[in-house]
Amino acid sequence: MTEFLGVDGGTIAYDVTGDGPLVILSHGIGDHRQAYRFLAPKLAQAGYRVASADLRGHGESSMGRMSVTGADDAITHPDIAADLLALIRHLGGPAVIVGHSISGGAATIAAVQAPDLVSAVVELNPFTKKQSLNLGGFLRIRRYRRGLSNLIGLQLFKRPGFWFRYLDVAYPTKPADYDAYMAALAAKLREPGRMAEFLKTGKSKPAETGTRLPEVSCPALIVMGTLDPDFADPRAEGDAIVAAMPAGIGTVAVVSGGGHYIHAQSPDEVAALVIGFLKEHARA
């Protein structure tokens, strides 16, 4: 059942399942909380209270909110972090945040800003540090070239076709409900204002998150898909994130053959990694 949390200037949509220590699931750009349709029930069955939330401007969450930066045309890592912390306070933290892509970076910021509320973070294929074009990778690695080209096209031409061509690359193998899920996502992005909200995430700057990595004090698990088209070398990206954290804080795991959406493509493997981590670090 969808619930709504009133936050500064709008509402965040979320649903809760299960009982136990609190786990917050936060999806990536251009998606909605149903991205965790496979992972959330597995975590609930393992004994956790799981809240899946829509990013601001996405899914059923409200549109048109002012960024914490003061801009009205941006959805940034700090914005998402603020919403996640508001949800944790509302539900009664502390919580472990599981953040995908942009939400991985947001989880980092939330953990630094409120260490009393965030007991640990799991970052799935995260954008948590400054990105730059890997020219050699662009020339040599087809998945990286195809993924990046479509993302550039999306920002330049603002047409959803580029996004769905990117998603085709980002899921190297498709879940059984892929076509139905993409149809539902396309319908959501056709709603008035939704595509414009999605494009606001292009104003986010992972570099502002990367500068906070040395301040992380809670355990962190970084999970990378080896075929993620967003990175020329996904394992190296994960290693670099952990290297920027204090020694002993972070751990990297990889999902062989996984794309950018490992939680939907390989939910059993991701669930095993996350549940093992939660058993050590989640607390009521």
What residues fall within each predicted segment?
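Conserved HGGG/HGGXW glycine-rich cap/lid loop of the alpha/beta-hydrolase fold
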Residues: 15-64
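Flexible "cap/lid" loop of the alpha/beta hydrolase fold
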Residues: 112, 120-152
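Conserved alpha/beta-hydrolase catalytic His-Asp/Glu region
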Residues: 132-133, 154-215
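Conserved loop-alpha-helix segment in the C-terminal half of the alpha/beta-hydrolase fold
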Residues: 217-258
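Catalytic active-site module of serine/aspartate enzymes centered on a nucleophile-bearing elbow/loop
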Residues: 246-284
